[in-house]
């Protein structure tokens, strides 16, 4: 139904199953919006002339669109960043101080772990909750016993980028709300997939990227900050307002947006959000679950395939991670790409502790991630390729 902008490469149909890395293909209106912005707008907030005002309208329009999409209190709750990584660095360094205690999990991406390691060296206490072999975290039994008098925040990913398993966000949110803790959510995999209503949610800070489930371009993302929560900026400088003050503006969103915005990227992101709204979150999620469920059911029938993660509930992202006979995942991914033009992700997925929990630290995992633009036929072709690879010996890949 939504295949009018599929791409054929070298005369063959490319099967792109790396949607968790970046969505592809992008809606044509994304690129169109970016090009139009390059030719029709100046610098947002940097002048009173037509070109500058046009830029300000583009930035505000996208901000308002995102606020409505996420159910935020108002557009000023949304600040633009380069990506989810910048948003997470901003959130963690902006709320935690030496002597504070923060809780996270083994599910996390390095975009959470590495900033926390730096903060730990500066005096922040860090607790990492273990994951099960299935890639889940038992929050009800683990969180209460890890609470300390100086606990300030909990930061978790909404869904693992390795297995696709989603956490019990409601439990964690209520736990934070009841104890006055700051709840920071990494929505890199769930923005554009999960329907948020932030003004009614216990989420205090939501970090998202634009180039995955929101179908925007790479290089633009954002951070939602609930009114009443203060986040110190990572950078200060030009803001377009309060020029003669020695301090950077403290009000949102200017507080977190020093310097020139990526206006073409922001325009493209708005076009991506418009696309998601037009298709419908519910429809996207249902189609992606249908594809994921079908692929999981069929791939587990292939000899030598081990699948990771919990598939007992449709409350998950469209990801299936697996290995074949314990072969190194990078070799399997390379074979799929070179022999079948099937593009996947292998290795550690920037989530080292999760691979430790899954027991895949040495070989990594072969990750298939889908979007509603993928088809059953593409998955059938992929399953045939996996049956082929499964029938081979290790030496065949060397």
Where are these regions (language model features)?
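Pyridoxal 5′-phosphate
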Residues: 1-398
């Amino acid at each position: 139904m939504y295949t009018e902008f599929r791409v054929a490469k070298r005369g063959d149909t490319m099967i792109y199953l790396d949607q968790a890395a970046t969505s592809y293909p992008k809606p044509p209106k994304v690129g169109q919006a970016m090009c139009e912005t390059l030719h029709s707008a100046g610098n947002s907030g940097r002048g009173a002339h037509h070109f500058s005002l046009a830029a300000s309208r583009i930035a505000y329009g996208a901000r308002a669109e995102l606020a409505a999409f996420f159910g935020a209190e108002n557009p000023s709750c949304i600040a633009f960043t380069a990506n989810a990584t910048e948003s997470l660095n901003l959130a963690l360094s902006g709320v935690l101080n030496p002597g504070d205690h923060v809780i996270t999990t083994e599910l996390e991406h390095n975009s959470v772990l590495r900033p926390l390691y730096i903060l730990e060296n500066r005096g922040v206490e860090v607790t990492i909750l273990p994951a099960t072999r299935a890639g889940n975290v038992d929050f009800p039994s683990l969180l209460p016993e890890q609470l300390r008098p100086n606990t300030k925040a909990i930061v978790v990913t909404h869904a693992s980028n390795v297995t696709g398993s989603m956490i019990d966000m409601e439990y964690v949110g209520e736990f934070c709300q009841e104890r006055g803790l700051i709840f920071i959510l990494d929505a890199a995999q769930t923005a554009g997939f999960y329907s948020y209503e932030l003004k009614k949610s216990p989420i205090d800070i939501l970090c998202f990227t634009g180039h995955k489930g929101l179908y925007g371009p790479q290089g633009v993302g954002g951070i939602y900050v609930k009114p009443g929560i203060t986040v110190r900026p990572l950078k200060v400088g030009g803001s377009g307002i309060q020029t003669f003050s020695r301090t950077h503006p403290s009000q949102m969103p200017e507080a977190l947006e020093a310097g020139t915005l990526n206006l073409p990227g922001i325009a493209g992101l708005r076009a991506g959000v418009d696309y998601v709204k037009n298709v419908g979150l519910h429809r996207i999620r249902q189609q992606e679950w249908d594809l994921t469920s079908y692929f999981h059911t069929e791939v587990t029938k292939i000899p030598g395939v081990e699948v990771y993660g919990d598939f007992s509930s449709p409350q998950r992202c469209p990801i299936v991670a697996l290995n074949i006979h314990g072969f190194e995942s990078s070799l399997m991914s390379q074979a799929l790409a070179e022999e079948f033009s099937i593009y996947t992700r292998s290795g550690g997925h920037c989530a080292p502790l999760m691979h430790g929990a899954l027991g895949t630290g040495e070989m990594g995992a072969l990750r298939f991630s889908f979007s509603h633009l993928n088809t059953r036929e593409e998955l059938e072709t992929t399953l045939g390729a996996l049956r082929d690879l499964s029938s081979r010996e290790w030496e065949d890949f060397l």
